[in-house]
């Protein structure tokens, strides 16, 4: 009877090989078993047995060419992911205060059925990105603007981009009726990377005072007269005119467009998670689900 120790070690070898193979493409020359066993610190025999079991399960097909080496001929990403032993997947999401965010969360949950997929909802894209980079979470949803402007974006990988207005509607300048020319105090939530970047660009060269305000309080603070204006995503259900407020849509500057696009981020070195997303999530199906949630056709489940 095969020992439990051998079975456990073969499982480790399978997981190691699966993670390695997920980063390879068909036609690529593979590392030798000797080199892989050295990297994994397991015997050559164990690595050979693990590779054979992956081939027998039809997770991969290997073409062996003697001295020229072995090449990846066929790959089944879904099967390999089962062997990769990824475990729970946690995605950092914005707080679900819009139907668009709820639609994304619900769509991801449904498309990743069969994988233990969970969400951590938190305010502030910089915080979500930091948690991703520090290994606290596996994925993070932010705007394209926040992802590209983050100081450590070289360590980020945009695993999926969803197009304009998939994250928010276009942001607008919100101010009290008839008071656009007298804007001096501008609300800013320092935890919102998007709002910081857009506010800085919109008011460049203008004599204003930035006032720290929670993003969700911007409208109330303008109405009460504590601030004069804010760059804000109007979204659904806000009767601005009835509240004595006006909006102005900024020019089609690149940063305002990028702030409306949702992207799903992974760490650049986390190939299995990137492959998981590519394998499980169909972009068009995700967007259709989101649009149906926004339209009220279906209720979000996440």
Locate predicted features.
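HTH-adjacent hinge/linker in prokaryotic transcriptional regulators
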Residues: 52-104
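Extreme N-terminal segment that seeds HTH/winged-HTH DNA-binding domains in transcriptional regulators
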Residues: 1-32
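C-terminal regulatory/effector modules of DNA-binding transcriptional regulators
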Residues: 123-125, 133-302
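Generic structural signal for residues in well-ordered beta-strands
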Residues: 60, 117-120, 208-210
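Short coil turns linking two alpha-helices in DNA-binding domains
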Residues: 41-50
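Short alpha-helix C-terminal cap/hinge motif
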Residues: 99-120, 201-202
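A short alpha-helical element within helix-turn-helix/winged-helix DNA-binding domains
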Residues: 27-40, 54
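Short, hydrophobic-biased segments on the C-terminal half of alpha helices
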Residues: 51-52, 129
């Amino acid at each position: 009877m095969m020992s439990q120790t051998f079975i456990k070690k073969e499982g480790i070898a399978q997981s190691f090989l699966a993670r390695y193979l997920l980063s390879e493409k068909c036609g690529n020359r593979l590392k030798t078993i000797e080199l892989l066993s050295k990297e994994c610190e397991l015997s050559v025999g164990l690595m050979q047995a693990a590779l054979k079991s992956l081939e027998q399960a039809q997770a991969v097909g290997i073409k062996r060419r003697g001295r020229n080496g072995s090449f990846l001929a066929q790959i089944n990403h879904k099967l390999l992911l089962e062997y990769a032993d990824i475990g729970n997947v946690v995605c950092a999401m914005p707080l679900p205060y819009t139907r668009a965010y709820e639609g994304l969360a619900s769509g991801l949950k449904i498309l990743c059925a069969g994988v233990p997929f969970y969400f951590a909802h938190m305010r502030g894209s910089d915080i979500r990105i930091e948690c991703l980079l520090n290994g606290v979470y596996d994925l993070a949803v932010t705007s394209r603007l926040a992802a590209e402007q983050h100081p450590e974006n070289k360590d980020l990988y945009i695993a999926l981009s969803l197009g304009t207005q998939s994250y928010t509607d276009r942001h607008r300048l919100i101010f009290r009726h008839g008071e656009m020319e007298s804007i001096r105090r501008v609300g800013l939530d320092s935890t919102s990377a998007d709002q910081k970047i857009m506010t800085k660009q919109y008011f460049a060269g203008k004599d204003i005072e930035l006032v720290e305000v929670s993003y969700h309080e911007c409208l109330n603070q303008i109405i009460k007269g504590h601030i004069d204006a804010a760059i804000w995503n109007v979204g659904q259900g806000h009767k601005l005119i009835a509240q004595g407020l006006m909006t102005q849509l900024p020019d089609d500057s690149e940063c305002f467009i990028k702030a409306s696009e949702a992207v799903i981020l992974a760490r650049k070195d986390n190939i299995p998670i990137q492959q998981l997303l590519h394998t499980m999530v169909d972009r068009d199906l995700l967007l259709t689900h989101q649009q149906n949630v926004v339209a009220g056709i279906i209720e979000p489940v996440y």
